[in-house]
Amino acid sequence: MRKTITGLLAILGLLLLSSGTSSANEGSIAFVGARIIDGTLADPIEDGVVVITDGRIRTVGPRSAVTVPAGAQIIDVAGKTIMPGIINAHGHVGGTLGLEGGHYNTDNLLRQLGLYARYGVTTVNSLGGDEEQGFALRNEQFDQSLERARIYVAGSVVVGNSEVEIRAEVNRNADMGANFIKVRIDDELGTAEKMPRNIFDALVDQAHIRRLPVAAHLFYLDDAKYILNSGADLVAHSVRDLPIDGEFIDLINAKGVCYIPTLTREVSTFVYESEPEFFSDPYFLKEAEPAIL
């Protein structure tokens, strides 16, 4: 299984970097012989071909049905799997270096986004803590020479003690060009006061006036149901106090809301009680920061 995952992610990184340079080569690149999962729920394509021309994927299909352009660079990827880039729907980029905070800068953003790309993650939604440098990189990423993951940003996590304050904070992030509005509504396990519901309602209203989706950090099932009925667009964490019930499932389906369970984040709260298996995985260790280990 480890070899399969390694092969899959390695070819994702190869596709990302090669597609960014093909325009400079003024030609096409054909990845030949892979299993291809196209993300549409269709059956995998065996012995497939992906053709990239001028930095864009032009053709995907079985070898028998794809004509490789004359003069194309051909890369044999037999035994590997190609799939669409992975999306990190809830991340935070650029703020840490090793175990230290306070390192939000362009170089650190580029370092982390490059690491994402090398492991097959091609898009990151950064939901909070984003500063001007992150917005600038977001604005520069629509270029086929890109050699990192794309980033979409929320700006600062929105807080306010009144409806007037919360609307002003939404407007501040919107004026910066945020892609989302991020808010925490829980009590941080009893250490803080929950956001009053009238203030959350005002936040949602103002965000939607500014045509921005609302991503809500939460913990409790009753809050999850409330924000769904109030108009939240992304549930940014798992419900963690109770098992979800039929009412919650029906609400998610009826509202068409994105549910981001952040399961790996939850695993991180207990997996280090003993040494996890991936600490001996060469693929993980290749780019793991020594300060974290």
Describe each PLM feature range.
Residues 16-28:
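Bacterial Sec-dependent signal peptides at the C-terminal "C-region" and cleavage site
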Residues 27, 36, 42-83:
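Histidine-rich, glycine-flanked metal-binding segment
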Residues 109-132, 148-156, 176-188, 213, ...:
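Divalent metal-dependent hydrolysis catalytic cores, especially in the metallo-beta-lactamase
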Residues 142-154, 195-216, 252, 256-261:
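Alpha-helix-loop-beta-strand connector modules within alpha/beta enzyme cores
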Residues 156-205, 226-229, 234, 289:
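Active-site gating/metal-coordination segments in enzymes
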Residues 168-191, 239-293:
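Active-site neighborhoods of metal-dependent hydrolases
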